[in-house]
Amino acid sequence: MSLLTEVETYVLSIIPSGPLKAEIAQRLEDVFAGKNTDLEALMEWLKTRPILSPLTKGILGFVFTLTVPSERGLQRRRFVQNALNGNGDPNNMDRAVKLYKKLKREITFHGAKEVALSYSTGALASCMGLIYNRMGTVTTEVAFGLLCATCEQIADSQHRSHRQMATTTNPLIRHENRMVLASTTAKAMEQVAGSSEQAAEAMEVANQARQMVQAMRTIGTHPNSSAGLRDNLLENLQAYQKRMGVQMQRFK
């Protein structure tokens, strides 16, 4: 796996699924392929994206700044600086300085990543801030190692949170989660269906599912009533794809 492929993988792992994730993936591909060379426009685009947390925007801004060639005097962006200041905690800054001194001795991506993984997310973000603000310089490979260690820590905590929700025994949370998943699956079905005549059936199924979820939320239903809703949708989608001659893995 090439270095840039690895970086792209780690960065995308912390971005929530949806159309915005697909858009960000495309921008990263373009940047890594040298197709997008306007850093100013890229940062302006990133700043105005909805949904993303300030830290995620800071991480993406760090990647773009490392990768896109730019004028030496180009101003650093405030939204990235604020995101990479370790919440203003002096302890994070102290640890970031210690980490930076260790990273100066590293020359490889994997070496830097290993060193960085033993620090907290706040310290890692602060260390990225030091490099972003030109207070310290390391090789691009080492900076990418630091970045990927940060993404790995964030992805780990997101995974723990998702797992807790998936295994919760609270019937109300499970019920709502099934309905949310059914809605997003319906949306995916509509995108897969496209605009062909044969797509009408898949669109109809997706539309009915969304109406059902809306009705369930409006009138309030028994927590077990949503069981199997998403699986039924997926079966319908697979049946439609088979008829269209498309074989696709489940959205699971």
Curated annotation (Swiss-Prot):
Chain spans, region RNP-binding: 165-252
Disulfide links within the chain: none
Compartments where located: Virion membrane; Host nucleus
UniProt-listed GO biological process terms: viral budding from plasma membrane
Region (Membrane-binding): 1-164
GO molecular-function term, one example from the UniProt record: RNA binding
Membrane as UniProt keyword: yes
Domain of life: Viruses
Keyword RNA-binding: yes
Chain positions of motif Nuclear localization signal: 101-105
Any GO CC annotation of this UniProt entry: host cell nucleus
Stored InterPro entries: Flu_matrix_M1 (IPR036039), Flu_matrix_M1_C (IPR013188), Flu_matrix_M1_N (IPR001561), Flu_matrix_M1_N_sub1 (IPR015423), Flu_matrix_M1_N_sub2 (IPR015799), INFV_M1 (IPR037533)
Topological relation to the membrane, as annotated: Peripheral membrane protein
Family: Belongs to the influenza viruses Matrix protein M1 family.
Subunit relationships: Homodimer and homomultimer. Interacts with NEP. Binds ribonucleocapsid by both interacting with genomic RNA and NP protein. May interact with HA and NA. Cannot bind NP without genomic RNA.
HAMAP family cross-referenced by the UniProt entry: INFV_M1
Further remarks about this protein from its record: Most abundant protein in virion. When expressed alone can form virus-like particles in transfected cells.
Record-given protein name: Matrix protein 1
Species: Influenza A virus (strain A/Chicken/Hong Kong/YU562/2001 H5N1 genotype B)
